[in-house]
């Protein structure tokens, strides 16, 4: 096959390259891009893709086991009323159609080394749209499973490693440009170059462009809306980790207080007793006792109800110091000087997962942020944390909010017709669900009440852990919901979601647009969504 170069004109800041003609896959290898280089372009036969092995980064004990490819730190797949597991899931690659796989290295700064991949389905199977997918944890790898899901649905898709290898923050030490890359630049540059490649391959720009991510990916999504409102027509942002260094230091502060106070640490063997007490107090508030709190905001559980009798300390009770720790876990962490909320408290219903944030080993992502960004010392010991000084150090380490995405003014995104679909597990033990409620309300307060239900919607998912997993109905096609909203202009007010055990659906429930909650109609199976109605509930506000 004769290889031919594609003539590309650098047209504007918002589009680094455009193509004068459609292309074959291999010809994309010589596509001229600004501050970027195509390193490979090859056809992949249907069902033939095998993802590369995840990177191994020495020096972070247990990182691979906790974070995994998506950086979700193992929240999915533990415990819960129905086991919470999603085992025996089919491979996302086995049924993929043939596609053109393009790998690109981006160098927007002299210290940038951002890897992206762009997958382009054959023209007959392309739906004419583009879906970028986000990362988790500290990123450091391409999100292949999410790309596969997007490709299988007919999208041209892209993902980035955000400019470093491995799901740790060690890249940040001495490399401020790499912090900028993971903060916001990598995803924007990925978006620009992916659109150029799509245009070059099909001789047509995508009709609609979407971003779909959870956790770090959720933050990446709202960062795009805040900083680059023209990049996407619609954004799915799940479990948005928008708090940056505030969130990390807030967790460290609570954890430090718990571990430094004699007898205050709550060991995992006591979690079931606390969880059972919460369910006893609040599970019936929605009219259905099913091991799931439909609206944890309405739960008024006092851990003191579990306080041990004098001289006792068993797995079924909490010592006075542990009672205070439980109250602290449920309560927002606040700046000791200003009183500002650093991160929200965990919701009732999260108890089986408390070890995700609070354990003697510490919360890995927060420790890494403190070591490599706040303290700039890889040997920093969390045991030396001093709230009086270290909270401020952490905040000053990110003076330009590179890692923080709390700006509620996304009017420019909405003015273009952009749609923001937020979702969050009420039982998320890692990115507190209160944070989603607060950001959603902040946007409405800033931009105006008229955007609620028109441009922004939030869906709180009872019983769902971090991004997925747990006893709640955590499975629904987020991209399809967003696409329907963008295409029809009709905002969803109810999404039917499923709970799967070993790949089989054993429950469906409606996920209601916040602040509504699902109410059982009083007849029919409580495992069938058609027997529930979305209705208003009185207790819906987040932390102030």
What are these regions (language model features)?
Residues 421-424:
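Short beta-strand/loop motif that positions the catalytic acidic residue
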Residues 2-21:
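Gram-negative bacterial Sec-dependent N-terminal signal peptides
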Residues 88-92, 127, 132-206, 249-250, ...:
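Cap/lid segment of the alpha/beta-hydrolase catalytic domain
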Residues 455-469, 500-504:
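Histidine-bearing beta->alpha loop at or near hydrolase active sites
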Residues 19-128, 288-293, 302-380, 480-490, ...:
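Catalytic-loop region of hydrolases
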Residues 430-434:
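Conserved alpha/beta-hydrolase "acid-adjacent" motif
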Residues 223-225, 230-334, 460, 480:
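A catalytic-pocket lid/entrance helix-loop region that shapes and gates access to the active site
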Residues 213-217, 221, 428:
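Gly/Ala-rich beta-loop-alpha elbow adjacent to hydrolase catalytic centers
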């Amino acid at each position: 096959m004769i290889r031919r170069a594609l003539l590309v004109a650098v047209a504007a800041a918002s589009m680094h390259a455009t193509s004068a003609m459609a292309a074959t896959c291999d010809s994309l290898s010589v596509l001229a891009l600004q501050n970027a280089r195509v390193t490979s372009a090859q056809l992949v036969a249907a069902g033939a893709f095998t993802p590369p092995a995840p990177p191994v980064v020495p020096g972070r004990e247990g990182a691979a086991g906790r974070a995994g490819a998506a950086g979700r730190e193992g929240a999915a797949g533990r415990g819960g009323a129905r086991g919470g597991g999603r085992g025996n899931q089919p491979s996302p690659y086995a049924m993929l159609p043939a596609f053109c796989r393009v790998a690109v290295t981006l160098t927007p700064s002299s210290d940038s080394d951002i890897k992206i991949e762009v997958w382009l389905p054959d023209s007959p199977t392309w739906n004419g749209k583009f879906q970028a997918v986000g990362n988790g944890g500290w990123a450091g790898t391409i999100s292949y499973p999410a790309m596969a899901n997007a490709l299988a649905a007919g999208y041209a898709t892209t993902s980035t490693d955000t400019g470093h290898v491995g799901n740790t923050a060690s890249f940040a030490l001495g490399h401020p440009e790499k912090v900028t890359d993971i903060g916001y630049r990598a995803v924007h540059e990925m978006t620009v170059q992916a659109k150029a490649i799509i245009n070059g391959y099909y001789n047509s720009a995508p009709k609609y462009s979407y971003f779909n991510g959870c956790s770090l990916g959720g933050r990446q999504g709202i960062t795009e809306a805040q900083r680059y409102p023209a990049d996407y027509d619609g954004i799915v942002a799940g479990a948005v980790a928008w708090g940056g260094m505030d969130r990390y230091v807030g967790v460290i502060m609570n954890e430090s207080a718990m571990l430094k106070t004699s007898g205050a640490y709550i060991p995992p063997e006591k979690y079931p007793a606390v969880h059972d007490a919460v369910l006893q107090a609040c599970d019936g508030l929605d009219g259905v006792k099913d091991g799931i709190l439909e609206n944890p905001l309405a739960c008024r559980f006092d851990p003191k109800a579990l306080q041990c009798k004098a001289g006792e300390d068993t797995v079924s009770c909490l010592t006075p110091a542990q009672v205070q720790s439980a109250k602290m876990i449920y309560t927002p962490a606040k700046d000791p000087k200003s009183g500002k909320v650093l991160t929200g408290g965990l919701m009732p219903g999260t108890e089986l997962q408390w070890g995700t944030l609070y354990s003697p080993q510490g919360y890995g992502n927060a420790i890494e942020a403190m070591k490599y960004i706040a303290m700039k010392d890889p040997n920093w010991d969390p045991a030396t944390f001093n709230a009086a000084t270290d909270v401020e150090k952490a905040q000053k380490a990110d003076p330009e909010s590179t890692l923080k995405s709390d700006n509620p003014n996304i009017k420019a995104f909405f003015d273009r017709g952009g749609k923001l679909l937020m979702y969050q597990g009420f039982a998320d033990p890692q990115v507190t669900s209160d944070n989603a409620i607060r950001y959603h309300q902040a946007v409405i307060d800033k931009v105006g009440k008229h955007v609620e239900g028109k441009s922004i919607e939030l869906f709180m998912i009872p019983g769902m852990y971090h991004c997925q997993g747990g006893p709640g109905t955590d499975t629904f096609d987020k991209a399809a919901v967003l696409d329907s909203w963008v295409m029809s202009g009709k905002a969803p007010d109810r999404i039917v979601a499923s709970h799967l055990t070993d790949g089989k659906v054993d429950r469906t429930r409606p996920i209601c647009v916040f602040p509504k909650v699902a109410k059982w109609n009083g007849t029919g199976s409580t495992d069938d969504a058609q027997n529930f109605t979305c209705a208003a509930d009185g207790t819906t506000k987040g932390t102030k």
